[in-house]
Amino acid sequence: MERIKELRDLMSQSRTREILTTTTVDHMAIIKRYTSGRQEKNPALRMKWMMAMKYPITADKRIMEMIPERNEQGQTLWSKTNDAGSDRIMVSPLAVTWWNRNGPTAVTTHYPKVYKTYFEKVERLKNGTFGPVHFRNQIKIRRRVDTNPGHADLSAKEAQDVIMEVVFPNEVGAQLLTSESQLKITQEKKEELQDCKIAPLMVAYMLERELVRKTRFLPVAGGTSSVYIEVLHLTQGTCWEQMYAPGGEVRNDDIDQSLIIAARNIVRRATVSTDPLASLLEMCHSTQIGGIRMVDILKQNPTEEQAVDICKAAMGLKISSSFSFGGFTFKRTSGTSVRREEEILTGNLQTLKIQIHEGYEEFTIVGKRATAILRKATQRLVQLIISGKDEQSIAEAIIVAMVFSQEDCMIKAVRGDLNFMNRANQRLNPMHQLLRHFQKDAKILFQNWGIEPIDNIMGMTGILPDMTPSTEMSLRGIRISKTGVDEYSSTERIVVSIDRFLRVRDQRGNVLLSPEEVSETQGTEKLTITYSSSMMWEINGPESILVNTYQWIIKNWETVKIQWSQDPTILYNKIEFEPFQSLIPKAARAQYSGFVRTLFQQMRDVLGTFDTVQIIKLLPFAAAPPEQSRIQFSSLTVNVRGSGMRILIRGNSPVFNYNKTTKRLTVLGKDAGALMNDPDEGTTGIESAVLRGFLILGKENKRYGPALSISELGNLAKGEKANVLIGQGDVVLVMKRKRDSSILTDSQTATKRIRMATN
């Protein structure tokens, strides 16, 4: 206050004011500071000072022809005075206003296309809903987030090539655009931006925004998808939050979300197959998300989630060095440990073989709803500082940390036997056995852990065994903090290996991920996920299995047909029929299979009884191991729509309906495709069934007279030759076999020979 008074007194004297306003500043240090370098040292002041002048702007002389000297109010818009040091003229800010109102207009069609990301953002904000503001302590943790909604996922290099090709096509040699997405985007953008008058550099900047994911490491308390991050400054402060629902979704968020769902489904399905790794790769390669191949997305998308990382590891891609346990992400921040296998006894005297980590280590632990710092020594939790959204989340994190610490009192708290199984009915490894046990009920664990008095430290409280907060006592080594623990910020990726059971290890052999870590949460994907692999047909329930199985048979009918007549066993063992078995009542599988296989054998043996529709309809039932019996069926039952539905051996039913006129098959009312050749001729399909006992010699030979129909063939004597009309109106020359013994081989050669003879 004294100082201010003194200054006021000084300023009231006119001499002070005069000195301050008229004296030159000749202190060398000050002059140096404000004149060295091109960088403006005080931009705000400079701007104010410039705008206070009459003509703060310079412009090209041509402006004198384009703008009148005075506006409607008679104010001068430009001065004839030249700008010192250049041949430009001095212009008033009013000229800008005049230009904006009366200047020439440009074609605006390209603006929404070039500035697409901005236009879309405005729409999202206009349609978004801002809710009430709540004042409360915000536990924010820094996470790597996507700050750029609406982008494709190209790498910087790929984007650069696309931009050069679109914006500066003549500046460079032909760009090597390799990926599907690069080519698609380039073509789209070239069409959109034809005759675009916007400065190329600006177009390039804007294209970069559209093509590349921009991530930043920001403190976040709520949603982390890019449509929330773009309004972060509006939705959360230090002590307040504002509810917000975005006014639109963007494809990049949808891809991230759908990728996680697809990866989880694939890992879960692969776990239960005989060769999990091979199955996982087959599924990743045959799946599409929103019309883009999943493997292409995996290569470009930086999403870090357990299932996604397992898929990446299987493809030989690098992943983050952090590891996962109990659904939390662990990152070692200091210390080292060596592993030693040891047998330990649980409280139930069950022996467990556990890899004990010896040594002092510190970790950050980050989950969706709780974060923590853990310091541990060999089989000892030294300190756990934890923060979380609510009691439940904090408890989850404490259990994970206690199990991870491998403390003896945790192992001794086990009651009952540990025999948890994974989806493939294999026993879980011991650490996950313990985790599952305490996730079910941690009461004894918390009770046996022990409590200690605590010091009063700012921002820290204690937590009691019943998970209530306390300022006096706390579980041994455990404190609750008001501030969150930041996610691991590094984007470093490491080379990993994966074994056939999908366990991912770093180069030192530490397990980073395993299928046990994949979340069981079910979600609905935002983009269409198309699983072409038969292993995923069951994902959408029984109806989907039914439709997909029949679609597959129809799509591959040419090969199926040949196998049906030549190698039925190989056909019956096809993996594509596996999902279908789950629809057949267990008790009936073997009987149905035996019945259908016998029926098929009769078709092969008896001339002219080949019936395409019937083979397609019954084929999936022949896949189960057969049981020979005399039972005849007129219909077969499948369990769909919550009850048994019948497929008739002869004729149509709601489950399987073939329309002779349109030649299309509908399964449960859904179209399953068209049959190319007419299934009604008892003689079509591969003529092998018909031409048993005949040798196909080659193309038609007129010497042997007009073509006979198949029914007339029976009249030939052994060794006699004749032309015969088969299936699709082709004529071939055949000879009736002299010996019956070789009849079986005919069906195999017939197929090949008919092909050769008719081509």
Curated annotation (Swiss-Prot):
Keyword terms: Cap snatching, Eukaryotic host gene expression shutoff by virus, Eukaryotic host transcription shutoff by virus, Host gene expression shutoff by virus, Host nucleus, Host-virus interaction, Inhibition of host RNA polymerase II by virus, mRNA capping, mRNA processing, Viral transcription, Virion
Cellular compartments per GO CC: host cell nucleus; virion component
Summary of subunit composition and partner proteins: Influenza RNA polymerase is composed of three subunits: PB1, PB2 and PA. Interacts (via N-terminus) with PB1 (via C-terminus). Interacts with nucleoprotein NP (via N-terminus).
Compartmental location: Virion; Host nucleus
A Pfam family per the record: Flu_PB2_7th
Function: Plays an essential role in transcription initiation and cap-stealing mechanism, in which cellular capped pre-mRNAs are used to generate primers for viral transcription. Recognizes and binds the 7-methylguanosine-containing cap of the target pre-RNA which is subsequently cleaved after 10-13 nucleotides by the viral protein PA. Plays a role in the initiation of the viral genome replication and modulates the activity of the ribonucleoprotein (RNP) complex.
InterPro entries: Flu_PB2_2nd, Flu_PB2_6th, Flu_PB2_C, Flu_PB2_CAP-bd, Flu_PB2_middle, Flu_PB2_N, INV_PB2, PB2_helical
Protein name: Polymerase basic protein 2
UniProt site positions, description: Avian adaptation: 627
One GO BP: 7-methylguanosine mRNA capping
HAMAP family cross-referenced by the UniProt entry: INV_PB2
Motif (Nuclear localization signal): 736-739
The keyword Lipid metabolism is assigned to this record: no
Annotated organism of origin: Influenza A virus (strain A/Equine/Prague/1/1956 H7N7)
Family membership: Belongs to the influenza viruses PB2 family.
Molecular function as annotated in GO: RNA binding; RNA-directed RNA polymerase activity
Acyltransferase listed as a keyword: no
